[in-house]
Amino acid sequence: YNKAHTMLQAYALITQNVRWSSCVQLENGRQVSQLVMRSASGPNAIQTNMSALFGTKASAAVQPLDLDISLDEPARLQGVISKPTMGLGRSSGDRQYFYLNGRPWDCTKLAHICNQVYRTFNATQYPTVIANLIIGPDKYDVNVSPDKRTLYVHDETALLERIRELLEDTFSPSRGVFAVDEPKKLS
């Protein structure tokens, strides 16, 4: 059940203008709603969908991600990633969703890069990542596994290295920056 629920969440995060509803039939015959939402549309759809699924607190802990990773042809990485501030990440990498042109994608290499770069800024946590890699349809092959979630990307190594560089650039302004609480008067 958990695997199916996670898969539905992955689709609900990336789709636009779709009504999602799923429930679980308990042994006593009672139904419990697990996922009820209408996916948003527009430029902030991923963050809005994230807020609907995981709550506004989770949505407030992320920043937009829009990286131009073009090498020979146009390519972008769009979505959201946790702000590299202590306390805004997660204790595990359970909220990392990757897509290739809107198709859910099991990409452990991209997850590893996101985790590695993020942990240079926040060493104790993992980022929430919802990232859609947008490349030309002739730059990847979906016929790798029956579930179509394992994809072969042409020039994958160069694209991933470019993503690493741009993620480091994105986070670098926050290097060495710490959140400070309001000063309190000692009595």
Predicted regions and their residues:
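Glycine/threonine-rich ATP-lid/beta-loop region of ATP-binding domains
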Residues: Y1-Y97, N101-W105
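Charged regulatory segments coupled to nucleotide-binding catalytic modules in large multidomain enzymes
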Residues: E73, P84-K185
